[in-house]
Amino acid sequence: MKYIILVLLCLTTSIVLGQDPIERPEKKNDSLSLGKKTKPINPKEKMENDSITLTIEDYKIISFERDTTYLDTTLTLQKEYKYNYLREDDFELMPFGNIGQAYNELGVDFERVGSYPNLGALAKDRKYLEREQIKYYNVATPMTELFFKTTLEEGQLLDANLAFNTSRRLNFSIGYIGFRSLGKYNDTQIESGNFTTTTNYISKNGRYTLRAHIAAQNIESEENGGLSDREEQFESGDEDFINRPRVDVLLDDANNKILGKRYYLDHQYKLVRTQLDSTRFEKTALSIGHSFEYETKYYQFLETSNDTLFGDAILSEIDDKAILKTFYNEANIQFYNKTLGKLVGGVNMYNYDYYFNSVFIEEDGTVIPNRLNGTEIGLVGDYEKRIGGFDFKADLRYNLSGELAGNVFNASASYSLNKNNKIKFSLHTSTRLPNFNYLLYQSEYLNYNWDNSEVFEKERASSLKGELFSKTWGNLMVKYSNLDNYTYFAPVSDEEIADGMDNAFIKPLQEGNTVSHLKVKYQKEFKVGMFALNNTVMYQNVTQDSQVLNVPQLVTRNTLYFSSDVFKKAMYLQTGVTFKYFTAYNMNGYNPVLGEFYVQNKEELGGYPLLDFFINARIQQTRIYLKAEHFNSSFSGYDYYAAPNYPYRDFVIRFGLVWNFFS
């Protein structure tokens, strides 16, 4: 609540400051200039008769990798694809019935971002913002962005962010994402809150730079276990059950939650620097740097009374809680030379403590410990260099001591053939242990207790990717991946498992043979006048000895849309229809106790179309969205599952807006 109050106060201030109108430039809808005369940011630096014209390039957004982009208030089809709860293109995902409930994967990637295992519960934490997802800002005047979208039944989604500079060298931002959706089916309510605040600073002489953020996040979901009579109450299309609260579900008193807090700091100091050359870049620089991160995170499953759906239980009331605390420190030195390139080398220390609140003793006397903890020490290295038209990048994370981490190596080379065509090749290799919930888990449910910390081997992933970016021919990506010791969840029993009882026998397993995965993705838009057809197609093929990795062979999304200025260019309009389809396959099942997906090979799901109709508009810096989602649900058959027993949502109309304003 204190975060919400703080954000509301900041937004109120920003709205008051933002009442000065920002003139719309007489250009096409690319919002390249704000066209506003304003005073310098720092009143102390004010000069007589001084005024400046602000452009969109005065509003910078800086990524974790320190890549800088500018505020974009255009209305494009890509913005339509990203206008959702995750605020990312969900082409390779299949959402569940309620917004934010879970997302089954239609496409998979094996690249590891970090060297260390995660807490787990991956089906529930897609909205949990990792440090690589936090953005930093540098803005000429205070900038506010409001993202709003309706949800299902009660609730809404609001993402508010305020960024402001107190001087040309110091920036602060504060953001809060508040979300609630009751859902159409019983006991599927989802609530989440993501509070973030950031700062970044550069000293007057440019030698010292700092950036930091704090994130406090929680995601809470009711769990209904899926439909109890799906043939009679869903697949039949019986009008008595079109009102979804009448549909019977398996659970009515269960929920799970993820809660985490993170503190992050990264700063550098230039020991040696030379004067700028004619291109305004330093010829040589030598810097030392330090980064720090402390995070606490837990996953909890609660149930007021146990259910046979998950097998036998020790206690009637279920309260399973896995906690992870991590502490990361890195010291590095960075050398830059215009001829030699940029080289970073350093050493890091990672301390972890993953634990439960009790020790579990099995009937045969086997003790399952309640804790995994230790310290890992490793080396880091990064290299960047541009040679002619080639851009080379490489990074290495190498573990010196410890049991968890392995090695991560990424390398890429890109080349611009001309202004319209670019190619890029990437290589990835990594080794590390699976996530903590595969290694150690404890639950009040007897079958959900295991210790694989001394049994499981490190997963080894490698991939080679080639990409073509062409304004003429479209964008093509081809990637081939190998994975050894692939780890997954699946039902395991010496006896035949009855239908609907998979969740009572879920165990973590590790595949001893190599799994190979081919992924080909192509995107191309055809345009004729004001009409356009945007196409994205993905093909996948898996080579494996056992059926442990299931993905659809083909996924396609095609959007036919119309774009034009209307009302004497006072509004820019986009409207169209999106078609999405994926071939039937053994879609992964969902497990509420773990908040994870598991492999099942009993039934194929998929092979159904999804049709959406949208009308979007842009007025100055405001984008308005209106969509009829899955409007074909009532006449294309009731077989649209997102996972076994979990249907996708029915036809629904939703609307919202994204509004940027300045002061």
Name the predicted role of every residue range.
Residues 156-178, 187-220:
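Transmembrane beta-barrel wall of Gram-negative outer-membrane proteins
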Residues 3-12:
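Sec-dependent N-terminal signal peptides
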Residues 206-266, 297-307, 314-315, 322, ...:
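Flexible loop and strand-edge segments within Gram-negative outer membrane beta-barrel domains
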Residues 15-84, 276-277:
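Sec-dependent signal peptide cleavage junction
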Residues 18, 114, 139-141, 258-303, ...:
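Exposed, low-structure sequence patches enriched in small/polar residues
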Residues 75-131, 138:
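Low-complexity, highly charged intrinsically disordered N-terminal segments
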Residues 118-119, 126, 130-162, 183:
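Short strand-turn segments of transmembrane beta-barrel domains in outer membranes
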